[in-house]
């Protein structure tokens, strides 16, 4: 691949041509791999690991993370696209195919001896015009918490990752989960939506739990497995004897001294446990009230036995991330000490129960009032399907979050690309000189999205583009109906793209494409490139 680097005495123009050819072929190659995934009619890819592990996905981020990419230019494009997903949660595939198409459209001008700098300048002008047009084209929503609008956004995102029937099933749960944790004038924290997986049943199923699901159960056979009307104590207190943080030795002379030392340790832990039992007896003054302890640290067998005899359900070693979720879902305060226990520090839930599935235990905390945390429970027959649903669910949550924060939407189905192409054609007429060739290349590259949507749906790309452009010329906002291949109104059909995703795609892709076009030589660097660029002894 890099054999050209080793050639000596080659002409500068020849080297530049080879470097450009290398970069363009890398962009087009990565584009050809991912373009078939785009849209609701996109195909799946099978990833096979070295150990024989198999993963089925059409998510661009998953593919680019898991694929082994040897080509340096392709790796650069992949890093750019995955950064897009880290920022906005979507648009990875669109970014890759846009960069690839920009390089592809530039190639024909380069073959006519147009300097790459001219094309790059055209890209810069077209990028600014495209982003300005996006500001005009977006549709500002007065109420971004409108449930119907958010359902349309979630459905558009999920249908590109999952079969339509499964995506429609998940849509309402994604929207309801976000609306549940939303606090006015505060940023949305998606970590407050726990995604829990359970492998069983014959088909994929997803449910929203307005509470919490913990992936462990009780550790004592006599503890209650189901409680109603529960007070919940969340704490981070060690209910077992712990070794000191500094090395310490305790010396004893005989067996009686050792027994007294062990008894002293047990009494110390048992005293903490009795404080919990006393609080339980204070608040549970009627038989219909119950008590649950969820501890981040350990609970030793003696304390578990004491709690079980008092009728308390005790869970130990809860995950750290679940402690904040518990307090947001159930109320109360997470306690780091048992010295100041009061009824005010307790949360409440109508139902707490344990469910066993094979060798796994799950604890459900349901029936909470005004929860600001929830759990989306995914059930599926295979690990592959569960992972596919989980990846799509994360993208759906990010899509709804982006819409709430953007306070606007963009008509989807390729509508923006068709409209932006027409606007750039008008803009090109106002520019003089060869820079307009870069604008033309950028405009042609925009059409790769509707073309790919049409091709993946089984329709002729050129015929489809002509139909869409003719309809747009009549003054209509028009997108592609992937079912029929005909133009449709994306607003009335409820098909929307995310403003922040499109803005990031058309801000970053021309920058990367321009940088790749301006590379005239590829040089193999030494091992010290990651370290200091200053030779030793010259600092």
From Swiss-Prot:
Localization (cell): Cytoplasm
Coiled-coil residue spans: none
Domain of life (superkingdom): Eukaryota
GO cellular component: chaperonin-containing T-complex; phagocytic vesicle
Keyword Hydrolase: no
One example of a Gene Ontology biological process annotation: protein folding
Gene3D superfamilies assigned: GroEL, GroEL-like equatorial domain, TCP-1-like chaperonin intermediate domain
MF terms in GO: ATP binding; ATP hydrolysis activity; ATP-dependent protein folding chaperone; unfolded protein binding
Keyword Nucleotide-binding (UniProt): yes
Keywords for this protein: ATP-binding, Chaperone, Cytoplasm, Nucleotide-binding
Function, in words: Molecular chaperone; assists the folding of proteins upon ATP hydrolysis. Known to play a role, in vitro, in the folding of actin and tubulin.
Subunit structure: Heterooligomeric complex of about 850 to 900 kDa that forms two stacked rings, 12 to 16 nm in diameter.
Similarity remark: Belongs to the TCP-1 chaperonin family.
Protein name: T-complex protein 1 subunit zeta
Annotated source species: Dictyostelium discoideum (Social amoeba)
Underlying gene: cct6
């Amino acid at each position: 691949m890099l054999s050209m680097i080793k050639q000596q005495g080659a002409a500068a123009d020849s080297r530049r041509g080879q470097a450009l050819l290398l970069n363009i072929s890398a962009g087009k190659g990565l584009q050809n791999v991912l373009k078939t995934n785009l849209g609701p009619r996109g195909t799946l890819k099978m990833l096979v690991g070295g150990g024989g592990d198999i993963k089925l996905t059409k998510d661009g981020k998953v593919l680019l993370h898991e694929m082994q990419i040897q080509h340096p230019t392709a790796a650069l494009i992949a890093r750019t696209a995955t950064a897009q997903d880290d920022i906005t949660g979507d648009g990875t595939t669109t970014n890759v195919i846009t960069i690839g198409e920009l390089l592809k459209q530039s190639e024909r001008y380069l073959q006519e001896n147009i300097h790459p700098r001219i094309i790059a300048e055209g890209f810069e002008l077209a990028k600014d015009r495209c982003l300005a047009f996006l500001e005009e084209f977006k549709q500002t929503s007065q109420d971004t918490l409108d449930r119907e609008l958010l359902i349309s956004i979630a459905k558009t995102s999920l249908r590109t990752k999952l079969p339509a029937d499964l995506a429609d099933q998940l849509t309402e749960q994604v929207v309801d989960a976000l609306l549940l944790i939303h606090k006015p004038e505060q940023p949305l924290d998606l970590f407050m939506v726990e995604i829990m997986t359970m492998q069983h049943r014959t088909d994929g199923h997803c449910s929203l739990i307005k509470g919490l699901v913990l992936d462990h159960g009780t550790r004592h056979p006599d503890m209650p497995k189901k409680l109603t009307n529960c007070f919940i104590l969340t704490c981070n207190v060690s209910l077992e004897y712990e070794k000191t943080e500094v090395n310490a030795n305790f010396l004893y002379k005989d067996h009686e001294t050792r027994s007294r030392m062990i008894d002293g340790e047990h009494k110390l832990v048992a005293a903490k446990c009795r404080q919990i039992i006393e609080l339980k007896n204070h608040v549970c003054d009627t038989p219909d009230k119950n008590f649950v302890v969820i501890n981040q640290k350990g609970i030793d067998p003696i304390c578990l036995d004491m709690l079980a005899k008092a009728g308390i359900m005790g869970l130990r070693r809860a995950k750290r991330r679940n402690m904040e979720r518990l307090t947001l879902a159930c109320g109360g305060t997470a306690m780091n000490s048992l010295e100041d226990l009061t009824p005010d520090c307790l949360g409440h839930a109508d139902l707490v129960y344990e469910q066993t599935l094979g060798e796994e235990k799950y604890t459900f905390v349901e029936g909470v009032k005004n929860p600001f945390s929830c759990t989306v429970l995914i059930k599926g027959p295979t690990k592959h399907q569960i992972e596919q649903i989980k990846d799509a669910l994360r993208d759906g949550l990010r899509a709804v979050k982006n819409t709430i924060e953007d306070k606007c939407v963009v008509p989807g189905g390729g509508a923006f690309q068709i409209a932006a192409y027409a606007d750039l054609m008008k803009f090109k007429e106002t520019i003089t000189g060869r820079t307009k060739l870069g604008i033309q290349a950028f405009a042609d590259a925009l059409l790769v999205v509707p073309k790919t949507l049409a091709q993946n749906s089984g329709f002729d790309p050129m015929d489809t583009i002509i139909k869409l452009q003719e309809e747009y010329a009549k003054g209509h906002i028009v997108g592609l109906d992937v079912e029929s291949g005909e133009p449709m109104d994306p607003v009335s059909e409820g098909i929307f793209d995310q403003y922040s995703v499109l803005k990031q795609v058309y801000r970053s892709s021309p920058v990367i494409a321009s940088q790749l076009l301006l590379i005239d030589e590829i040089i193999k660097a030494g091992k010290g490139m990651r370290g200091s660029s200053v030779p030793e002894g010259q600092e």
